[in-house]
Amino acid sequence: MFSQLDFTGLPLANTGENRPLAIAVAMSNFVKKTLQKQADLRDDWQRKLPTLADCGNYAERLTIYLSTINDEVQLSHCLRNFRHREMARLSFIQSNKLATVEFVFEQLSDLAEAIILAARDWLFTRCCAEYGTPVNGLGEIQPLLIIGMGKLGGRELNFSSDIDLIFTYPEAGQTVGGHKTIENSKFFTRLGQRLIKALDEITVDGFVYRTDMRLRPFGDNGALVLSFAAMEDYYQEQGRDWERYAMIKAKILGEDLTDVNHRYLQQMLRPFVYRRYLDFSAIQSLREMKQKISREVLRRNLQDNIKLGAGGIREIEFIVQTFQMIRGGRDKILQQRSLLQVLPHLVTLNLLTKQQAKHLGDAYIFHRQLENVLQAIDDQQTQSLPADAKNQARIMYACQSYWQKDQQNQPLMIEYHWQSWQQFLSTLAQHQQHVRVIFNQLIGEEEQANQSPVNEQLAIWQDILHPEIRQLELAEVLRDYPVATEDYATIFHLLANTLQDWSKRPIGVRGRKVLSQLMPKVMHSICSKTDYLVVLPRLLNIIDRVTTRTTYLELLQEKDQILPLLERLCGHSIMVAEQIARYPMLLDEFIINKSLMKVIEFEQYKTELTEYLIRIPEEDEEALIDALRQFKQGHLLRIAVADILGVLPVMKISDHLTYLAAAIISEVVNMAWKSLVKRFGKPTHLAEDERGFAVIAYGKLGGLELGYNSDLDLVFLHNAPLEGETSGRRSISNHQFYLKLAQKINSIFNLNTSAGVLYEVDMRLRPSGDAGLLVSTFQAYQYYQQHEAWTWETQALVRGRCVYGSASLIDEFSRIRRTTLCLARTRGRLRQEISQMRHKMYQHLTKTSTGQFNLKTDQGGITDIEFIAQSIVLEYAHCYPEMAKWSDNVRIFTAAIECGILSQHIGEGLKNAYTRIRNRIHQLNLLQLPSIVNDTEFVSERAFVTKIWQQIFTDNE
């Protein structure tokens, strides 16, 4: 067996006095490289081979070694050289079986502790020279205390382990004696950063220790160094069971219980780790931790990992530390860091049988010997069995005989007689089986009712979704989904930023538990879709807004139909996603309306709005305005859902948006009216229930074609005599009253509250535009329309419709509109003016790039179709009055077919083109995208519309 090892390349024979050195070199590439790099060490070993007496006393020797250095570059070089020399010596001791396994990992731990403290002390002196000395309020010097976690704290460090550290200092304060005073927190942060660099940075000399700071409070998101008070607050208020588990092995490096700071820190942490009562609640937390590791083993194919695999080191630690967490508060003999020292106490307390303790101890030593040999080969942190014959031979040689301590703490030789790698594996499997049996007896795997592939996948997501999420772990999970490799980084950064931000929020225990269950569902579902990059940021934004509102999180987690619906909405509409994120109260719609996609009837908008506002006092105007916006957003959401789910056709979508706007206009007028009447009284010419005021809608609202982002084109009219006035104590003229009413209506619409702006209102279509009065009498309006209006203003009147007013005022406006539209016009002049106006619009509005088509402004688009409809009305209404009846384009084309103005083919073709293009605009509105598409879309519709346009306007020029 031993003959398989390679001793070539060195001037050494495999016999005699050089045999131990040959064994050390053959067993470890690291030792060989260290001897090649450090000639003085090689010379020392050739004069005198390492012995047990050479081990230890690291701090004193290192102090001498560092006494001559002047800067951090030299510090880095010396630390690495010293570490490599001592590690090579311990590898020699291990390879030649000169000491017990326990001795080796105790020495590895002592070496690490000495190096860390020496580096800290040297850097502390340097930082004091640069920044001053940190002191508390009493002027007492404040030290940096370092807590060693894991195997370092338990004095069980393996050969090439990383080190888990937590930095802390006693009290806040400032530095003294430096060029510039800085806070203690800043001083210790800088010191900590320089210490990590001194240990962790890979230089030409290698590294000292891979340094992991993620076990500190808040992990990577937390401060690098915390005061005692901040640490105490964290562990009392936010400390979790896995942190208690980790703290079992915590040790203050350089521990000195005569030091008041050391005593205080230890007394502060002990109650967090060890509860005064039997803490059976820890079992489930530990079980969940183990299940998480088991899933990681499967996910990363780590079954051969001697640390994480079944029956490995981690399960042995779980068994022992579970007893420590449950019983350690009451049975203080369990409050020890070393696993091997705790085992006999578990037997004394009848928590383990002697045989169980022996099986666990033997398996632990066997695994630790195997782990150390594996890592000593190349100074690499590995726990996976090798596949090559050379390294397998090294392992078999090291593990077929080794020393361990017996029950009397005396060296005991353990021997195996393997002839093959399979025999070694059989012994390993036997140890692991012993551990596995005990683990299942004592802790076990709680029966999982639904171990379906989906639930397994959700569990894996739950494992990796934490503030310290790792990109490689995420990539391993994403490989099971139809996610492009080039998108992995985008998803990682999105998740990392989100999860880190959430970790700093006061979410509470209940909320965090719900989030931990919800997020795996979200990620599994979204990553299973093709539009994951669209949906994920939008849905995360919604969840982000409700992280501190646990009720909403529970709604998303518990109601199975809501999350898929939200994902679908987010995929189809950024507008909807942003509305829900901005106003989370819209999620109430999902609770109240189980059939959210069923919108109400048109006539119900007014009655529902009235009922919605009843609960708010009339005098609370701000609350009323807020409620109006909430009502609009809630129903806008329901309409959008119906649109996205295909419940309503495009024409009905616009109808609902139009009726919703009309209901809101009515309530806005009511609010403004009551406010004005309360201040000034009402115009005296009015009867009891009259207001003498009308709101005329133009554009898309007038044409019953409102879109999601449409503004409201409004004109205000009244029927008051000019000489009249109001009836209040502060009487004003009728004109002033209606002017103030119009201004008040405008201010309500445009007021920006926490619920957003109600509607953008455009009043430029009133007589004389911006130069005209904000509100006109019916008589003045009629005169202007029939004697002064430009052709484009009369075109706009085609889409005019009274959306608020008494029946008599609605009739009056309809009469004015009808008589105006039915005036006879010269065909040639009319077509020329409309064509010229369209040409001006095209020149000023169309800025579409090559290869694109603007659905609204480009030739063959919506504007051309609208102009065709308006042209037909203005040209033929004097002959066919029914052409003046409708304000919407579709019914205008229907009337034109019925009157014989358009053929069935042309009329239906225009309606089809109009509705299809409108539908596409709706879709783009939902995505908050401009109304621009690729010019390969709507080719036939554009050609048809352009052909009709030319027939009407070009061929007749």
Curated annotation (Swiss-Prot):
The keyword NADP does not apply. The keyword Chaperone does not apply. One of its GO terms (molecular function) is [glutamate-ammonia-ligase] adenylyltransferase activity. One of its GO terms (biological process) is regulation of glutamine family amino acid metabolic process. It catalyses: [glutamine synthetase]-O(4)-(5'-adenylyl)-L-tyrosine + phosphate = [glutamine synthetase]-L-tyrosine + ADP; [glutamine synthetase]-L-tyrosine + ATP = [glutamine synthetase]-O(4)-(5'-adenylyl)-L-tyrosine + diphosphate. Keywords: ATP-binding, Magnesium, Multifunctional enzyme, Nucleotide-binding, Nucleotidyltransferase, Transferase. Residues 454-957 are annotated as: Adenylyl transferase. One of its GO terms (cellular component) is cytosol. SUPFAM superfamilies: Nucleotidyltransferase, Nucleotidyltransferase substrate binding subunit/domain. Its EC number is 2.7.7.89, 2.7.7.42. Residues 1-447 are annotated as: Adenylyl removase. Involved in the regulation of glutamine synthetase GlnA, a key enzyme in the process to assimilate ammonia. When cellular nitrogen levels are high, the C-terminal adenylyl transferase (AT) inactivates GlnA by covalent transfer of an adenylyl group from ATP to specific tyrosine residue of GlnA, thus reducing its activity. Conversely, when nitrogen levels are low, the N-terminal adenylyl removase (AR) activates GlnA by removing the adenylyl group by phosphorolysis, increasing its activity. PANTHER family: BIFUNCTIONAL GLUTAMINE SYNTHETASE ADENYLYLTRANSFERASE_ADENYLYL-REMOVING ENZYME (PTHR30621:SF0), GLUTAMINE SYNTHETASE ADENYLYLTRANSFERASE (PTHR30621). Belongs to the GlnE family. This is Bifunctional glutamine synthetase adenylyltransferase/adenylyl-removing enzyme.
